[in-house]
Design a protein with these regions (language model features):
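Catalytic machinery of carbohydrate-active enzymes
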Residues: 1-251
Length: 251
């Protein structure tokens, strides 16, 4: 792999201004030729300043805050589709002389994941339609009411041509899933059954994913699966839709 990660201990040795200077020294020792700031917050601005003073080319993301503020303000909203975050990241690299072709389709290329790897857990697909449902998100404002989502689960569970897979994690989400699985025996909870790699494999074999504005929307997008995304406190115009997802599939 040509990607490596360097952790920032922001509550320990990299805490505060003194800690940022320590982090800068550690990063500078790597002798980077360029610095691309995809975050553009106070800490990264300071680090970029230090690199710039050391004559290392730096480029930072432009987040388009003005357009987003007009989109979310209470009155006189301006509902204009903002540039996607993917395009903004590519713009940063282009500033440094590395133009990016945004032609990615799937981590599996034109194929899907190895079905034999997940079949012991999922069973054979046969002629069934496989629907993934990811009903939760990190922030409550993004979650469609659970009792209403259960109605969706019940609807598809009653269809003998459909198999529903529930995606989530954590104790509270598992309690909800366990309740649904008990009521609807054809529904399968995937919590604790697959790791991240094999869960992506399963997603590649879905016919569609129903998700909030959450990580699962983006994971399904990585394997080129259509996502019906439900937006609550956020808006698909803000530039955070899943990769190559269609606006017509947003709710």
């Amino acid at each position: 792999a040509n990607v490596s990660f360097i952790g920032a201990d922001l509550t320990g040795k990299h805490k505060g201004l003194w800690g940022l200077n320590t982090l800068y020294s550690e990063l500078k020792a790597k002798r980077f030729d360029y610095v691309a700031d995809f975050h553009h917050v106070l800490r990264t601005k300071y680090l970029c300043l230090r690199f710039w003073l050391a004559n290392i080319p730096v480029a930072s993301i432009y987040k388009g805050r003005v357009g987003k503020e007009k989109l979310v303000r209470r009155r006189h909203k301006v509902l204009e589709n903002q540039k996607s975050s993917f395009r903004r990241y590519a713009d940063v690299l282009e500033k440094l002389g590395f133009p990016v072709l945004l032609n990615f389709s799937s981590i599996y290329g034109d194929e899907k994941g190895n079905f034999a790897e997940i079949e012991p857990v999922t069973g054979a697909k046969d002629n069934l339609k496989w629907i993934g449902i990811a009903p939760f998100a990190k922030h409550m404002g993004k979650i469609y009411p659970i009792e209403l989502q259960e109605q969706v689960v019940a609807h598809f569970a009653a269809d003998p041509k459909v198999k529903v897979f529930l995606f989530g994690g954590g104790k509270s989400e598992q309690e909800v899933f366990d309740g649904w699985v008990a009521k609807y025996p054809t529904v399968v909870s995937m919590i604790g059954k697959l790791n991240m790699r094999t869960e992506l494999n399963l997603m590649s074999h879905l016919d569609v994913m129903l998700s909030m504005d959450s990580a699962n929307m983006h994971l399904a997008s990585l394997v080129n699966i259509p996502v019906i995304s439900v937006w609550g406190a956020t808006h698909p115009y803000a530039g955070f839709m899943g990769w190559k997802q269609l606006p017509v599939n947003t709710v």
